Structures are given as C-alpha cells and as structure tokens.
Amino acid sequence: MNQQSTKTSDLIKAIIKKGTLKQEVYHKTLDIFNEFKSQSKTLVENNKEIVKKAKFPLLFEFSNHSAFEFQLKFGSDILIFFMHSNIFELPRDHEVMKTPYIKDDKTRSYGGLIHIFNFLADSFRYNRTNDLGYLIGRIFVNRELHYFIEGKREIGLLYNNFSYARLNQKTIKSILHSAILYTLNFDLLTPPFDNMKEVTVQEMQTTLDAMSIRTGKRLGFRFQADQVEE
C-alpha cells in the first residue's frame, strides 16, 4: 500500500470512528429524551383527574410537538423540553474536563444536550411574542449515560456529579420533579417601574395581548423609580 492509500485509509478510519461515536451519543441521548417524554406524559395521565378537582380550572397537559420537543403545562407555566440534534464536546476549560473520568477516556467528553425552558402559559395563549422565557436547566449526556446539569439553583446543584451520576428512570423522575418544583417557586415579579412608565400611543391602541411590553419572570429587581441620585 502506497503512502497516498495509507493516508486515505487513515482518513476513512477517522471518519468512521468519529461518526460512530457521535451516532452512539445521539441515540443514547434520544433514548433519555424519550424517557423524559414518557414520564411527563404518564405524570399528566395519572394525575389529571385529581387536578380537575381543584377549586378553579387548572392547566395540566402534556403535548408532543416533534421527535425533539414536548411541552408540559401546569398552572400558569409551561416547561418546554428540547433536545438538540447535534452532539457537542465539552470545552477544554470546563471543570469536568479536569476529572480522571474524562482524562481516562476523552470520548466521554462528547454528549448530547437536553434543554428545559420555562415560559408563562399566557404568553402562548395570547400570542405575546415579546414575552420572555428562561432556560432553567441544560442536561449533558454522554455515551455511558453519565450526565450533569447546568441550571438554576437546586437543579444545577443537585445533579452535577458527572463522573459517577448515571441517568435511569429514577434519576429522570427526580430531575423532572425538581424542574416542576423550581418552576412553581420561580414566581412572576412585578416589572421595574422604569421599564413600564413610558408607553406609546400605538401600544395603547393595540390590544393588551399584543402589546410590546414584555412579561416574564424575574430573578429580582431593585425599586429605583423614585430614587434620587446623590
């Protein structure tokens, strides 16, 4: 075999190796995403009759939108679960890259991503396209089903042991419940007065549902409208 043939052979081997790795990670991530989807659907089916007995009508629905997206609606909130179709490698400066788990096998640093977004249900119901949503959790899954979550508060703190933590039905249920509880406790706060005090005639003439005044949950704000600078 001449030198050119050897280079071509090495190239094909590299293509097969990297492609096979990414396909393995992709299918493992899709399996995990489908388990999230299945458990969300089951949660609604098993409890919707109980929710119907509440004093007022409450939103409690599951809806499948595609192979890579589903929505879980409850109360005034929506959780959107979205799986990215591509596979990613962790950045070299990421803390996980310093662990023996990754140093022993670099292919473990490749993973799929599952995003969990929180939106207000009314934002979709009334087509308020300027409303804000928040990424409350991002799940990184590798080919061995090891995972960690980058997320808000307890979501990110509870699930960040990548070297040892593996996804299964039990951990998926725990993550799902944590995401719902976090959303329930992440309340809508009154927007800062300075952001609201000036409104155009056009905005006032438009229906309230279509106004370009954003509505979204806030992590908090300082009341500054009446403060005088010293």
Enumerate the language-model features and the residues they cover.
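Short, solvent-exposed secondary-structure capping/transition elements
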Residues: 45-56, 82-83, 90-92, 188-192
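Residues that form generic nucleotide/phosphate-binding pockets
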Residues: 14, 18, 43, 175-178, ...
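Short, charged/polar micro-motifs that form catalytic or ligand-binding hotspots
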Residues: 19, 23-34, 158-169
